[in-house]
Amino acid sequence: AASDVYKRQIFNKVTEELRRLGCEVKVYAEKDFVEQGVKGDIIFDMARDKATIARLKSLEDGGALVINSAYGIDNCVRRPMTELLIKRGVPHPQSFIISTADEYSENCYPCWVKRGDSHAMVKEDVAYATCKEEVENILADFRNRDIPVAVINEHLQGDLVKFYGVHGTDFFYWFYPSPCSHSKFGLEKINGIAKGIPFSVEELKIQSDKAAEALNVPIYGGDCVISADGTLRIIDFNDWPSFARCREEAGGKIAECIYKRAKKQMK
């Protein structure tokens, strides 16, 4: 997939930048990392596989510095992400967490029904609904696929903005996704082409950094909706995205973030 190519490119770029800073970097495929029982004091990763994440957690528990933390990666699963962002006061749509076996009784339409137990893996894991019947159909599909929990977000009108950031650095990049560019879940189609509603980029960076702290993912990306009055609300947050449009600049800043944290760890 194109996104895998982009992810490999940013990972390679960070490796290159860390070597330029004088670090010795060894790169492993996830499978080899787990099977060979690789150890390390400082590890950076773009892990997705459950076995890798479990292995990283055990290394973290033993004192290793892992960026992004395997615990942080798990925090980006829809349900814990929603709970942690709301708890930390990060601006977020009205949300409900329900068992897929239960009836949805809130009167919140239109809305997005999202798989709650993992990252979205297929487009059916996030669906738009305008009435109770549509929500019930989506929940039935989740049940059929053994998905136990759903997160329901109110649909927000406004401009969809995507962003990338690196906590602890001045790096922050945002853009309007075009309706045709690797549309994530069709929100672009429903919200239409961005109108360019003015908003505070500084405020978006502050809230994004706050979300990164709440979730424990210093290298992050996400989506937010800017309402007509300029209010911003974060609707999605990801650990270590592809940084597809700003790879050159981001690579150096991610390396700087890892390097700074590594030096602190070694004191």
Regions from the PLM with identified roles:
Residues K13-E17, F199, E213-V217, I226-K267:
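C-terminal active-site "lid" helix and adjoining low-complexity regulatory extension at the edge
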Residues G40-F44, C111-K114, F163-G165, G230-R245:
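A short beta-strand motif that forms the metal-chelation/ATP-contact edge
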Residues Y128-L215:
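Phosphate-binding site of ATP-dependent enzymes
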Residues T15-Q36, I97-D102:
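A short, well-structured beta->alpha microelement
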Residues Y28-E60, A70-N75:
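N-terminal glycine-rich "phosphate-gripper" loop used for MgATP/nucleotide binding
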Residues Y28-E30, A150, V161, V217-D229:
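A short glycine-rich, hydrophobically flanked beta-strand micro-motif that places a catalytic Asp/Glu
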Residues A1-Y6:
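Short, small-residue-biased leader/transition segments that mark boundaries at the very start
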Residues E60-G63, Y71-L160, E202:
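Active-site nucleotide/adenylate-binding loops and adjacent lid/helix of ATP-dependent enzymes
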